[in-house]
């Protein structure tokens, strides 16, 4: 789960990482009030979960509260890379002497944690890595040993931070590691980490990604979810404990097991090339349980997507046998009733497949078409989607 900048900086501050005072506003009057409370020049910053805010006009300096109100009016509602700005952060303006970069992240490729640091901050780190790779220090972090002052010093030295700020940066690194671990994050990033004219180090901007798999021990994660920004179908699926990701196609996908679902996306995309370019509309893995309730919940979510023109149910019977899956589909269609109007292509294979096919055949539901092979079923689902588009 990605956080907004203001949420990230609140987490930083709670762990002792130095940040500037700020307040969030959802309208221009609130922005003016926040600027009045802070006093002096402020920066009005769009709160969206994407980069490039400055180039898009989403970050503006305001010299006084009235100007903060005007700048907030210009930013609120701004579309930044498809993200609509619904709130702004009003924060104290700061003069900047130098800009740096620092992050901790989960290094999935090496199954480890990684620290990345650079004295070339303030720009996209991908740009630094591409144009000046020697300016980006990467240090592997042992998850057992973690980051103490000595390890933080090693990181700071590797990145060649100036000696006059090294002690401050070491302290920030230790506290940022505490944030990373305590909050179950997969990314904590400060860009830029700045030095002000007084020589003080400040986290001027922040990015945090939290591991939602840790929500059972991080109850406050629920308070950080932005209900307005969440896709309504994904929110509905999440409420039903379904592993669902919305895509931009026309063929709804239900499968059991992430690998099978990913393969299904591929074969549907390939089949769609012959049928007006239709594509998969979602990823939905129902896992090992294909009960009537789970199947009904999955179909309810997928059929709620107006872009979906057909649904492909692709199940390989293992621990959950095909007859149980078939019964689940039949019961799900009864539960959904008149809502189950879009064509449903079902491919069953594996444990008790013949019994599963018999159950579906006897149910004789007008929306259901059975196809024996995965490629054939994908082709049929794509054909039906193209016809209904």
Swiss-Prot record:
Gene field: sucC
Reaction it catalyzes: succinate + ATP + CoA = succinyl-CoA + ADP + phosphate; GTP + succinate + CoA = succinyl-CoA + GDP + phosphate
Complex and partners: Heterotetramer of two alpha and two beta subunits.
Cofactor: Mg(2+)
Name used for this protein in its record: Succinate--CoA ligase [ADP-forming] subunit beta
Organism this protein belongs to: Saccharopolyspora erythraea (strain ATCC 11635 / DSM 40517 / JCM 4748 / NBRC 13426 / NCIMB 8594 / NRRL 2338)
Function field: Succinyl-CoA synthetase functions in the citric acid cycle (TCA), coupling the hydrolysis of succinyl-CoA to the synthesis of either ATP or GTP and thus represents the only step of substrate-level phosphorylation in the TCA. The beta subunit provides nucleotide specificity of the enzyme and binds the substrate succinate, while the binding sites for coenzyme A and phosphate are found in the alpha subunit.
Keywords in alphabetical order: ATP-binding, Ligase, Magnesium, Metal-binding, Nucleotide-binding, Tricarboxylic acid cycle
Source domain of life: Bacteria
